[in-house]
Amino acid sequence: MSMKNKLKNFFSMEDEEYEYEYIETERESHEEHEQKEKPAYNGNKPAGKQNVVSLQSVQKSSKVVLSEPRVYAEAQEIADHLKNRRAVVVNLQRIQHDQAKRIVDFLSGTVYAIGGDIQRIGSDIFLCTPDNVDVSGTISELISEDEHQRW
């Protein structure tokens, strides 16, 4: 009995494995057939070359704020604009010289802290820019020595 069962099991296992392999290959050919039937364009993926744009290069509209402070306390508002990544043109013509100098000192520190830049663009007029704004070129102006010594 044992020898007969062993032979029977031996031959029956081969048959089962063969059937299993046959089913396996049948599934593979069925999967290949399904892949061939799928359309070339998938709705989730665009066909062809993809154009990728960095999100950092797409910005909201940039703003330039014009400010004409009358007192030193308004310097903090200007600094807040710079922290919000907005360029600010500061006109200091209507403020006393000592107050104007304090404002320029305060804004210089603010601009340094955020990695920006401050430039004099006219008599008592300054351009303060955050790090996301690049200023190119210069404005040449004939300034008398008295005004030049003021700053």
Curated annotation (Swiss-Prot):
Entry's Gene Ontology cellular component terms: cytoplasm
Complex formation: Homodimer. Interacts with FtsZ.
InterPro entries reported for this sequence: Cell_div_SepF, Cell_div_SepF/SepF-rel, SepF-like_sf
Domain of life of the native organism: Bacteria
Keyword Cell cycle: yes
Keywords of this entry: Cell cycle, Cell division, Cytoplasm, Septation
GO molecular function: identical protein binding
Similarity comment: family membership: Belongs to the SepF family.
Region Disordered: start-end pairs: 23-53
Entries under Pfam families matching the protein: SepF (PF04472)
Annotated GO biological process: cell septum assembly; division septum assembly; FtsZ-dependent cytokinesis
Organism: Bacillus subtilis (strain 168)
The keyword Ion transport is annotated on this UniProt entry: no
Biased composition range(s): Basic and acidic residues: 24-39
Record's function text: Cell division protein that is part of the divisome complex and is recruited early to the Z-ring. Probably stimulates Z-ring formation, perhaps through the cross-linking of FtsZ protofilaments. Its function overlaps with FtsA.
Subcellular location: Cytoplasm
Entry protein name: Cell division protein SepF
The gene coding this protein: sepF
